[in-house]
Amino acid sequence: MKKRLLAAVLAGIMVFSMAGCSGTNSDSASDNGTDTQAGDTDSDEEQTEIQVFIAASLNTVMTDLAERYNEDHPDVKITYNADSSGTLLTQIQEGYECDIFFSAAQKQMDDLEADGLMVESTRANVVNNQVVVVTLKDSGTAVTGLEDIGKAESIALAGGSVPVGRYTRQAMVNLGMLPKADDVAAITTEEVSEALGGVEISEQDNVSKVLTAVVEGSCEVGTTYYSDTYGYEDDLDILQTVSYDLTGNVIYPIARVINEEADDAQTAAAEDFLKFILSDEAKEVFDSYYFDTNVE
């Protein structure tokens, strides 16, 4: 089984230490899958490390939550691997060590469960999100929302295997902009471009990269999550908040992953951290980062 050090295969490593970094967005969005470590201390006390795979759109809020958790549990080191849910699922299926999977869509969690990789009775829905169409503030774009997004000179769009890309494609199908498909995730970026009259589309492999493309001005518009606009209120205009009637609910499920390498301390730490994520205290934090915690 591949060991914990995903840094060897993932570009763009960010190390978060309780003493040195804040849990807020930096000036530019993260544009790579990242490993984030929380819970480092200066004491000689041995720490128990848990591996938590999180959708890229959860990076900021989960860093904050880890900081809060470590105030009472300094003996636990939480190592995050943040990327698209599809990429994370593939890594788990390939044998990367993981204790908790927090996905941005039900499909990836369904696949995890079907593969027998989930700890039974640990799955829970945590938050809901919403797809938004964004542009740089005062960009002067002619685009007003998804229905006329083809007016843009360039679009940042996540691939179909990325939840936000799939939700965007589903909305476009429901608007009649794309033909119906058994699996909207299979609609290629080239097909989307063709349906929009040949507009230039920059395909991104996670939602953070979509945000980066818009914030840095390399694309005129993009589709991301409402929660991703946290910290960018002065930089971005939300052109449209896409209705759930078009996308369906954007539910984020969480579950523990079977980890045969974990010892008793690691298993207990993973169980306790999952309980914390589902707590009322954590719900208040999610709410503050623009997530909707009114889910079943």
What annotation goes with each model-predicted range?
Residues M1-L5, L10-G12:
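Positively charged n-region of N-terminal signal peptides that target proteins for export
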Residues F16-G20:
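C-terminal motif of bacterial Sec signal peptides marking the signal peptidase cleavage site
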Residues S22-E67, G86, Q106, A114, ...:
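Exported/periplasmic ABC-transporter solute-binding proteins
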Residues R68-T79:
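Signal peptide-proximal N-terminal region
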Residues D75, E97-C98, C219:
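Short, high-confidence coil segments that cap the C-terminus of an alpha-helix
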Residues Y80-T90, E97-E113:
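Ligand-binding clamshell of periplasmic/extracellular solute-binding protein-like
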Residues D115-R123:
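A short, gly/pro- and small-residue-rich
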